[in-house]
Swiss-Prot record:
Organism for this UniProt entry: Aspergillus clavatus (strain ATCC 1007 / CBS 513.65 / DSM 816 / NCTC 3887 / NRRL 1 / QM 1276 / 107)
Family as reported in the entry's similarity comment: Belongs to the peptidase S9C family.
Gene: dpp5
Highest taxon above the source species: Eukaryota
Keywords for this protein: Aminopeptidase, Glycoprotein, Hydrolase, Protease, Secreted, Serine protease, Signal
GO function terms (MF aspect): aminopeptidase activity; serine-type endopeptidase activity
A GO term from the CC aspect: extracellular region
Glycosylation sites: 76, 97, 154, 257, 383, 453, 610
Protein name per Swiss-Prot or TrEMBL: Probable dipeptidyl-peptidase 5
Lineage of the species this protein comes from: Eukaryota, Fungi, Dikarya, Ascomycota, Pezizomycotina
GO BP of this protein: proteolysis
């Protein structure tokens, strides 16, 4: 492995917790999943870290010893964007160089040795910004790969750096989408490409065999991966290198109105046009199953393809069901554990091809479950991981799994687990490595259940540093988005409960009606009920905390939320619960009911409110924070955040709310980021976001006076416009 020194990444936890400040949270190292080598001895992972001193991000790749938990740096070259192990060779790596000496905007593929990373050679030059590489090594020693890039309709890869800037900035559309998430649609789209690195004779290295092939463009209107969140999990390469499977939304349906997606199968060489195994004309399509399909994964023998699919064609939070397709079969594709009341989101086959390991939300966690590949629909899977949230998992030679995950108290946790033994050994955890996270641990978090509107409801409770149950701490009441989402035992760099708590709060983060991971009925009950049962659940949560948690000061509490959580904060402002908080924070939330028609994904609103804007208008207005009877109750100081590139909920929603608050004389502030979307991800912007959010709530909760180290609005580092 060379002369590099292995460093211990598992150290004794600090005896005293250190406050999680916004600066620490944002600048803490962010590590990727750990990918093991074929022998299971070491794993490779990437790290990136932002410096507020240098105002830039650095990145590097490391190796993790899977026996000792020690690590060493493999390369500090920030242009290396991906690294893959080649075949069954423990010593050879393929890496992607994000720069291209020959083609600006392209990438290069390099082959190198673990022991001498810098002595590799260039195997291929690719003409665009390809990413998401997957490889298999054939019996002849060739490397077959797939990756994706932007594409023109004619199948040519799109390279932004080689495109001449148009003379006009006009955009013209004859159909929707016009814009999606944070981008206006153009004539280019994502596509999966295939290629082969040919093994040379007489120890000659690998070279690209011809040009890469676009596997998606022959299917009119197809796109894979599907933006904005699609990636390498939207496609797969069979272990024998013969087949490629990819997901695409239904080409024949308006994409803004339907969630329907198909899984396509195509030869790796593109010799035949891709066909949908579960499309409307496919003989094996399960009856009545028309929703989103995703996560195609080939079996080890390349004879079967597992995937997930929802039933409803307009519902993004429908229950995903596991299906296993036999390559070439015309029989109806069978479901596996089809009655399971959970919604799996990832799949891995066991090496023997007999069992499927799936990840799924489950009671505020993201857990792993083992399911026989031929299981009947009444099979009830059992989890074999417990706390935290699983991010990725890979099989080791002993058939255990190398798992990478997070938790509320750590942004990186690496351990081994198996269906038979559960969690076996923790190899590394960021809270025991990084100074920024030192002292965080499972004791920072607990959970409660309380009687909600119609069923028991779950909530997380997160404690401040040096928590003393004999003292009182103001309540920070956090409301999640979605609405079909959840507060999970996972790390977030945007809404981090521990960062709120360490200002001096006890955070309560409930999972009310509409939340995911607690059974499909709880998720579905929010339909046409946005301000009904969920609001009642939140009221009952506040009442439970007030009565049963004596260390929580509800008299000086605050409430904050984003997206649907932002809507709920706006709804709370105009209802009785709003009077129980000293301050409110609404991030990118809806305010004016009639403005919902401006969103990008129309199927979402039409499903949520049981019809179109014109046919079901009363439903859209049923829970309208901007209704006069609610506006007249506004009185709690409120921070409003809304960003220009949020095309899910247009910035006019935030401006409308701020106008009303100002006109009503309610203490209020408007925070806007012109370059951010529904989220705030730029580190410098994130720091300002945290300064404003925490400074706002600290001012009105009294934390600013009681905790000298707390964030204050006096810390504001950008000019504040005030004409008064």
């Amino acid at each position: 492995m060379g002369a590099l020194t292995w460093l211990s990444v598992v150290a004794a936890a600090a005896s005293t917790a250190l406050a999680m400040t916004p600066e620490k949270m944002i600048s803490a190292p962010r590590r990727s999943e750990v990918i093991p080598n074929p022998s299971g001895e070491i794993g490779v992972f990437s790290t990136s870290q932002y410096s507020f001193e240098k105002h830039k991000r650095s990145s590097w790749w490391s190796l993790l010893d899977l026996k000792t938990g020690q690590s060493k740096i493999l390369t500090n070259d920030s242009s290396v964007s991906e690294i893959l192990w080649l075949g069954t060779d423990d010593s050879t790596l393929l890496y992607v160089n994000g720069t291209n000496a020959d083609v600006p905007g392209g990438v290069e593929l390099w082959v190198t040795q673990v022991s001498s990373f810098t002595n590799g050679y260039k195997a291929a030059s690719l003409p665009a910004a390809f990413s998401g590489f997957k490889t298999v090594t054939t019996k002849s020693g060739d490397i077959r790969f797939v990756a994706y890039a932007q594409s023109y309709a004619n199948g040519t890869a799109y390279n932004e750096e080689l495109v001449e800037k148009p003379l006009s900035s006009a955009r013209i559309y004859d159909s929707i989408y016009v814009r999606h998430w944070d981008s206006y649609l153009t004539t280019t789209f994502n596509a999966v490409f295939s290629g082969t690195l040919k093994k040379g004779n007489n120890k000659k290295g690998y070279t690209l065999d011809g040009a890469v092939k676009n596997l998606v463009s022959p299917v009119r209107n197809a796109e894979s991966p599907y933006p904005p969140f699609g990636g390498a999990s939207d496609y797969d390469l069979s272990p024998n290198g013969k087949w490629v499977a990819f997901k695409s939304k239904a080409p024949e349906l308006p994409k803004a109105n339907f969630t329907t997606a198909y899984i396509y199968l195509v030869p790796h060489d593109g010799s035949e046009k891709a066909f949908a195994i579960n499309g409307p004309d496919s003989p094996g399509t399960p009856k009545g199953i028309k929703g989103d399909a995703n996560s195609p994964v080939f079996s080890p023998n390349s004879e079967k393809l597992a995937y997930l699919q929802m039933k409803d064609e307009t519902y993004e939070a429908d229950r995903r069901v596991l299906y296993v397709y036999s390559i070439g079969s015309k029989k109806t594709i069978p479901s596996v554990a089809g009655n399971w009341d959970r919604s799996p989101d990832s799949i891995k086959w066991t090496p023997d091809g007999k069992t499927l390991i799936v990840g799924s939300e489950d009671k505020g966690r993201s857990r792993l479950f083992a399911i026989p590949a031929t299981a009947r629909d009444d099979f009830k899977p059992k989890n074999f991981t417990d706390g935290g949230a699983v991010s990725a998992y890979y099989f080791l030679p002993d058939r255990s799994l190398l798992v990478t995950g997070t938790a509320i108290w750590t942004n990186w946790n690496v351990y081994t687990a198996s269906p038979a033994k559960g969690v076996i050994k923790t190899l590394a955890s960021a809270n025991e490595i990084d100074p920024e996270l030192k002292g965080l641990g499972p004791s920072d978090v607990s959970e409660i259940y309380f009687k909600g509107n119609w069923t028991d409801i779950h909530a997380w409770v997160v404690y401040p540093e040096n928590f003393d149950k004999s003292k009182k701490y103001p309540l920070a009441f956090l409301i999640h988005g979605g609405p079909q989402g959840s507060w999970a035992d996972s790390w977030s760099s945007r809404w981090n409960p521990k960062t709120f708590a360490d200002q001096g709060y006890v955070v309560v983060a409930p999972n009310p009606t509409g939340s995911t991971g607690f059974g499909q009925k709880l998720t579905d009950e929010i339909q046409n009920n946005w301000g009904g049962a969920p609001y009642d659940d939140l009221v009952k949560c506040w009442e439970y905390v007030n009565k049963n948690l004596p260390f929580v000061d509800t008299e000086h509490g605050i409430a904050a939320g984003a997206s649907y959580g932002g809507f709920m904060v706006n709804w709370i402002q105009g209802n009785d619960l709003g009077r129980r908080f000293k301050a409110l924070v609404s991030h990118d939330g809806t305010f004016v009911a009639d403005a919902k028609i401006s969103t990008d994904e129309l199927w979402f609103m039409q499903r949520e409110f049981n019809g179109t804007f014109w046919d079901a208008r009363d439903n859209y207005r049923r829970f309208d924070p901007s209704a006069p009877e609610h506006i007249r109750q506004f009185g709690t100081p409120q921070l409003v955040i809304h960003n220009d590139k949020d095309y899910r909920l247009a910035v006019a929603e935030g401006l409308s709310l701020f106008n009303v608050l100002q006109e009503r004389g309610v203490p209020s502030r408007f925070l806007n980021f012109p370059d951010e979307n529904h989220w705030v991800v730029n580190p410098e912007n994130s720091l300002v976001w945290h300064q404003q959010v925490l400074g706002w709530i600290n001012k009105y909760s009294g934390i600013e006076k009681s905790n000298p180290g707390a964030v204050s609005l006096d810390d504001t580092i950008v000019p504040v416009v005030n004409y008064n």
